[in-house]
Amino acid sequence: MKVMIVRDYDEMSRRAAEIVKEQILKKPDTVLGLATGSTPLGMYKYLIEMHKNGEIDFSNVITFNLDEYIGLSPDHPQSYHYFMYENLFNHINIKKENIHIPNGVAEDLEEECKRYEREIRRIGRIDLQILGIGVNGHIGFNEPDESIETKTHIVTLTEETINANKRFFKSIEEVPRRAITMGLSSIMKARKIMLLASGSNKAKAIKETLKGRLTTKVPSTVLALHPDVTIIIDKRAASLLTDEELANVELID
């Protein structure tokens, strides 16, 4: 596991965008796994800028988003469909048919989970999976006590996650209680994983992730089993790390 500790959110975003850019330059038909929320926003802004400057061509890139709220239509301002188009897809030359996001209003949600998993397998493998991390260590919407064997599935969100996401809604009552998410097994099949974290509120989750102790109580600890993980964190997210924990990882510049 490689760890990069950077100055602040902006530097985290820039360094993450550079890694995505390098991946696409190396493999123009790269399959990206994408995340939503405030953490990757800065990275998306840098990717848009790089595209406008002619540094990246997204025309052959394929994307799979980690998750989507159940009950929110694609045009709902808080749906992850809407988020991705507003903050990335509308500003780059990606083909619509190459964009994949779970359908949170599908008539048969269980079948939608199976369909999404089949589509990932049909394409092959995700080349670079981008992750954020929740305050409780969730990745995607895989909450504590989730089996590491899960594929794309329906999940009931914890109160902790609902409270963390209420800032995006007018009231906590509007926050969806369920979501479709790629499972831990789906995520771990990616060739490479890049996890981003910024801010002191993520420090405890990062500390648990880097302890090297696998526990279902902290879903992100499963990443220790993956052969190619890069974690980019700012100084505040790294603030609780000890020398012992840092000794377990490869620090990179």
Curated annotation (Swiss-Prot):
Disulfide bonds: none annotated. GO terms for molecular function: glucosamine-6-phosphate deaminase activity; identical protein binding. Pathway: Amino-sugar metabolism; N-acetylneuraminate degradation; D-fructose 6-phosphate from N-acetylneuraminate: step 5/5. One of its GO terms (biological process) is N-acetylneuraminate catabolic process. SUPFAM superfamilies: NagB/RpiA/CoA transferase-like. It holds the Pfam family Glucosamine_iso. Its EC number is 3.5.99.6. It catalyses: alpha-D-glucosamine 6-phosphate + H2O = beta-D-fructose 6-phosphate + NH4(+). The active site is at 67 (proton acceptor), 136 (for ring-opening step), 138 (proton acceptor), 143 (for ring-opening step). Keywords: Carbohydrate metabolism, Hydrolase. CDD domains: GlcN6P_deaminase. It comes from the Bacteria. InterPro entries: Glc/Gal-6P_isomerase, Glucosamine6P_isomerase, Glucosamine6P_isomerase_CS, NagB/RpiA_transferase-like. GO terms for cellular component: cytoplasm. Catalyzes the reversible isomerization-deamination of glucosamine 6-phosphate (GlcN6P) to form fructose 6-phosphate (Fru6P) and ammonium ion. Belongs to the glucosamine/galactosamine-6-phosphate isomerase family. NagB subfamily. This is Glucosamine-6-phosphate deaminase. The gene is nagB.
